[in-house]
A protein has these predicted regions:
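Intrinsically disordered, low-complexity and often Lys/Arg-enriched segments
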Residues: 1-8, 137-165
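Positively charged, structured surface patches that bind polyanionic biopolymers
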Residues: 1-39, 55, 122-131, 136
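Append "and, occasionally, other polyanion-binding protein interfaces
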Residues: 17, 23, 60, 64-65, ...
Length: 165
């Protein structure tokens, strides 16, 4: 005996709870582009993704005062560094260049860009652009956190030593 489509949808909705959900594909979650993000860029990606709704991919704002300060951001410099990193990774796509009275807008790179009522600088897409697939980890890129040297202990000495290099 099989359930009807409506009953199956109702069961699926109950299983995930009543809240909205975000379509975050597993190939994106497992990608080198996502793995290489700094913690601030990862947080910003989630803050941008939290603005997503069906039919509005491309309409996410990173306005510091009106949107992101309430989400815990305290530094514009940190925000813009994380934003630059996300755009370079291809995980987000700028859909409108900001100006004096309009903020820049962004889309999630693993979803198709929607129309959003003629306020974007780019056309809607039928399928995702997936620029994040072309991301390559830069081995020459220095980490934002300094390398912490490994501390070695000699069993016959009471003080640890730090190896060279």
């Amino acid at each position: 005996m099989s359930r009807s489509r409506d009953a199956a949808l109702k069961v699926a909705k109950q299983a995930r709870g009543n809240g909205a959900f975000l379509p975050f594909r597993l190939d994106v979650l497992r990608s080198p582009a996502l793995a290489a993000l700094s913690p601030y860029a990862s947080k910003l990606l989630l803050d941008i993704a939290s603005q997503w709704s069906m039919g509005k991919n491309g309409d996410a704002s990173v306005a510091f005062e009106k949107v992101l300060r309430a989400r815990g951001w305290r530094s514009k410099a940190t925000l813009y560094k994380a934003l630059k990193e996300l755009v370079a990774s291809g995980l987000i796509i700028q859909t409108r260049q900001g100006s004096l009275h309009e903020c820049s807008l962004y889309a999630l790179g693993w979803l198709a860009i929607d129309d959003c009522g003629d306020k974007l600088d780019v056309k809607r897409t039928a399928s995702p652009l997936d620029h994040w697939r072309k991301f390559e980890v830069d081995s020459n890129n220095s980490s934002s956190t300094p390398r912490v040297p490994m501390v070695l202990k000699k069993p016959h000495l009471s003080t640890p030593r730090v190896p060279d290099g």
